[in-house]
A protein has these predicted regions:
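Acidic interaction surfaces
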Residues: 1-124
């Protein structure tokens, strides 16, 4: 596991990997978008969730316990990262900090974000 820097909340939209690692065969990334963080896990090709769109989870009785639920699945994440199948979730829900929407909301330190990723990977 590598924590590159702490989450710094801003009003400017930026994209920066602030933590990354590998656990139990899953690569993972915590990305700051400036206004909020998101967590992503790369799903291996031999895993049952590979290429399953997150919008189909309910119909397939797939439940992943993460902050606000899975809100992303795609075969690409960011320039400079290997293509593959990624799932992810964001921290911009009701009660979460967002400079332009909820400036009084909760801010998440990178240690909490990494702990959340670890829990999801253990559940996968």
């Amino acid at each position: 596991m590598t924590i590159l820097k702490e989450m710094e909340y801003t009003t400017e939209k930026t994209i920066e990997v602030i933590a990354k690692g590998e656990m139990l065969g899953f690569e993972w990334f915590v990305i700051s978008y400036g206004t909020h963080p998101c967590c992503y896990i790369k799903i291996p090709e031999d895993h049952e969730l590979f290429e399953v769109d997150y919008r189909d989870y309910y119909d397939n009785d797939i439940h992943i316990n993460c902050h606000g639920g899975i809100t992303y699945s795609a075969n690409r994440l960011l320039d400079g990262l290997d293509d593959g199948w990624y799932i992810g979730w964001d921290y911009t829900h009701l009660g979460d900090y967002h400079a332009m929407i909820e400036p009084w909301g909760r801010k998440y330190p990178v240690s909490v974000l990494v702990a959340d990723v670890t829990e999801v990977i253990c559940d996968l």
